[in-house]
Amino acid sequence: MKKFYLSCLLLAPLFINAQTEIDGIMMSKNNFCFGAVYQYSSWDKYWEGTFKRENLNLGTVSTKSLALMGNYGVSDKLNIIFSLPYIETKASAGTMEGQKGLQDLSLTIKYMPFEKTIGKATYSLYALGGLSAPASNYSADYLPLSLGLKSKTASLRLMGDYQRGRFFSTVSGAYVKRANITIDRNSYYTNEIHYTNEVVMPDAISVNFRIGYRSNRLIAEAVLDNWVTQSGGFDITKNNIPFPSNTMNALKIGVNTKYTLKKIPALSIIGGCNFVTEGRNVGQSNTFYGGLFYILNFKKTLQENEK
């Protein structure tokens, strides 16, 4: 079974608000992995619809975040994962003030119903269900400096993993259902005028592929991630600011690594980066992250207490 008693999930996401669970590893029963990830992202160019342009009014838009994350092994086949990021945004030019505060609390249940070894290869399937909700009363109608979109979400992801020796590939796809939000004005314009403070949020599909090297102490992988908004969104109008229900598509490439210390096998160091190569109504961001995670073995603690 591809589980690691002394290693931890690659919890650092391509999207800080949701993607903390998409690898082919399960936390062992009664093990709790927890830690923090610091992430820095910035961009000075963005896509207005499909037209790429410079961000002269705001200069460089940057986002710093510190996320607390955890993963508990209910069983070897069932994990519960959570994350809560604190985010700070800033623009190097213009008059818009940056924002800071808690973003969204996310909770994911990860289940592995199938795993089989055939010859030298191991095949496994996973199902993941996730929920997220705003953890503070931030404003969504303040893009691109808002902390998030403030929409409650529900997601379902199916994932398959193939490993032969220490080399692996993982592919997954998710549908993200987003709830409507309310904003602090009574009318707004998309493709037409809306006389309400309620904004209908479009759903999204996420497809993720990763390939790399996986051992008990080292994981290194290349990642391709595609986020596509479904029908209901619209493009940023010319020379205007973004709106929460814009179509927001992003194709990202990245690298993730995790190293488990030999002398402290419960402690792991993670790091990585990702870059937006194609997009629609999003910034062309470059993102770098690093973090530390530690595993507590509650089963071992209980056994020691019983002695």
Per-range role (PLM):
Residues 38-44, 84-90, 113, 131-137, ...:
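Transmembrane beta-strands of outer-membrane beta-barrel pores
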Residues 25, 37, 69-71, 110-112, ...:
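Transmembrane beta-barrel domains of outer membrane proteins
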Residues 30, 62-66, 100-105, 123, ...:
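Residues that define the transmembrane beta-barrel architecture of outer-membrane proteins
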Residues 34-36, 80-82, 107, 123-129, ...:
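Transmembrane beta-strands of outer-membrane beta-barrel proteins
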Residues 40-65, 144-146:
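Surface-exposed strand-loop-strand hairpins of Gram-negative outer-membrane beta-barrel proteins
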Residues 95-199, 245:
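Outer-membrane pore/translocation modules
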Residues 47-49, 54-56, 193-307:
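Outer membrane beta-barrel transmembrane domains
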Residues 22-30, 77, 115-124, 166, ...:
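Short loop/turn motifs that connect adjacent beta-strands in outer-membrane beta-barrel proteins
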